[in-house]
A protein has these predicted regions:
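Gly/Pro-rich hinge or "lid" segments in bacterial periplasmic/extracellular proteins
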Residues: 1-23, 28-32, 170-171, 175-179, ...
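Extracellular/periplasmic solute-recognition and catalytic clefts
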Residues: 10, 25-97, 121, 125-127, ...
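Short, well-ordered beta-strand elements
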Residues: 19-25, 192-202, 224-226
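Extracytoplasmic/peripheral linker and loop segments enriched in polar/acidic and small residues
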Residues: 73-77, 84, 108-112, 116, ...
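Structural transition elements
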Residues: 100-101, 133-180, 201-208
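Long beta-strand-rich cores associated with HINT superfamily self-processing modules
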Residues: 275, 333-369
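Alpha-helical transmembrane segments
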Residues: 381-395
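Cytoplasmic C-terminal tails of single-pass
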Residues: 398-407
Length: 407
């Protein structure tokens, strides 16, 4: 939808590829890559990712409608292509854990309280520069089964107010925590504070994020401790179920809800299959599993959509993941590049790119036209400084010569 209006179909029906040659150059630093892009020597800001995060403040401004190009970038005629990936990044609960796991109403309330407290919108604004969308659903945008608007809101964590999803209040989180047996973040039986452990890869978290987590969970009296480790150690913990909360992510292999719903299919749980399964939460639900088996063999249509919707509801009701978001990247292309729309799954898209060579050469000359007036101005300034000295020197020499003649 919208491709015709955006001009993405101008080259439809032409023989592929649309360009004869593609040249890749490896830049070791972001700054020279960015500078050359603005000078017109690179057609796009990046291929594997947008390369815009490091230069975000120069490239974008955050306006009332979200992230927009800065005036300088917009004046260049540069095209902005936001790309919401068909994927999901999340922190999941280990459903076998004695504290956060389990399927009683008290355990659900505990997990929901933690979900509400984790302000994903704030997290994305601070640590991802707004490049992400809060996940209300296990299925990302662009995949059948993902719903937008009020119909797509997770009612356990958000409300629909004035045409937008609004996170439920910290007071609600505190109430749920008390009903779960942890008033003010303390075990009602022992009085001990509730302390949770999050396993992450070492490079995926820094002190700023850990301090932020301490603050947001401190609002409901819950203590958090990160346990960073390399991927091999983290994977070993997942395989043995030796985690409480873990970080993970998934990008689509193919555009079907099955490719995400299987993340909670119990035979995929490492503790069930004794394998490298993808259900790292070790979530188990007979109803969910049966629906998943039916979804696998049912063709797309209303019947299958209803099954998928029911599975999404089970995921929400059981509060299997602490938080989730859909990753987003922003790609920039110079004005002579056509067909810049990204494909979320396929990487073989360079054959669709087209270039207006004449415009590229014209813009390069315009943007890199040498500015010579400072040289002339500098020369005049230097001449203006030297000329009085030369004149005075000559006068002095002439005066000395006249005195010599008189003697």
């Amino acid at each position: 939808p919208g491709d015709l209006e955006a001009g993405n179909l101008k080259d439809a029906g032409k023989r592929l590829p649309l360009v004869d040659r593609v040249v890749f150059r490896l830049e070791k630093e972001v700054l020279p890559l960015w500078t050359k892009f603005l000078q017109g020597y690179y057609d796009r800001s990046g291929e594997n990712h947008g390369n815009t995060n490091s230069m975000f403040d120069q490239a974008f401004v955050v306006g009332p409608d979200g992230v927009e190009m800065s005036p300088d970038i917009a004046d260049h005629g540069i095209q902005m292509d936001p790309d919401v990936k068909p994927g999901i990044y999340y922190y999941g609960f280990n459903m076998r854990d004695p504290v956060v796991g389990g399927y009683t109403e008290e355990k659900r309330k505990l997990r929901r309280a933690l979900q509400i407290a984790f302000n994903v919108e704030e997290y994305l604004a601070i640590f991802r520069k707004g490049n992400g969308i809060t996940a209300q659903n296990i299925i990302p945008p662009g995949i059948r089964g993902h719903l937008e608007g009020e119909a797509g809101v997770n009612p356990y964590t958000h409300e629909w107010i004035d045409g937008a999803p609004v996170r439920r209040s910290i007071d609600e989180a505190k109430q749920l925590l008390a009903e779960a047996g942890y008033p003010n973040g303390r075990d009602a039986r022992t009085g001990e504070p509730l302390k949770l452990f999050i396993d992450v890869q070492s490079q995926a978290v820094d002190n700023t994020q850990m301090n932020w987590m301490d603050r947001i969970f401190g609002q409901i009296g819950v203590q958090i401790e990160y346990r960073p480790a390399d991927w091999n150690r983290t994977r070993e913990k997942l395989l043995t179920g030796n985690t409480q909360i873990y970080s993970y992510g998934w990008l689509a292999d193919y555009p079907d809800p099955e490719n995400f719903l299987f993340l909670l299919y119990s035979p995929e749980g490492p503790l069930n299959c004794k394998c490298d399964g993808s259900n790292n939460s070790n979530f188990e639900s007979e109803e969910y599993d049966e629906l998943f088996r039916q979804v696998r063999v049912t063709p797309p249509g209303p019947e299958r959509d209803a099954m998928v919707a029911r599975m999404v509801e089970i995921y929400r009701r059981e509060a299997v993941w602490l938080y989730a978001y859909y990753p987003k990247d922003i790609y920039l292309s110079n004005p002579w590049v056509r067909n810049t729309k990204r494909h979320g799954i396929s990487k073989a898209t360079l054959k669709y790119i087209n270039i207006d060579d004449e415009m590229r050469e014209r813009k390069r000359a315009e943007w890199n036209n040498p500015v010579t007036w400072p040289l002339y101005a500098g020369a005049l300034l230097i001449a203006g400084m030297i000329l009085p000295g030369v004149t005075a020197y000559r006068r002095r020499q002439n005066a000395t010569a006249r005195r010599s003649d008189n003697n």
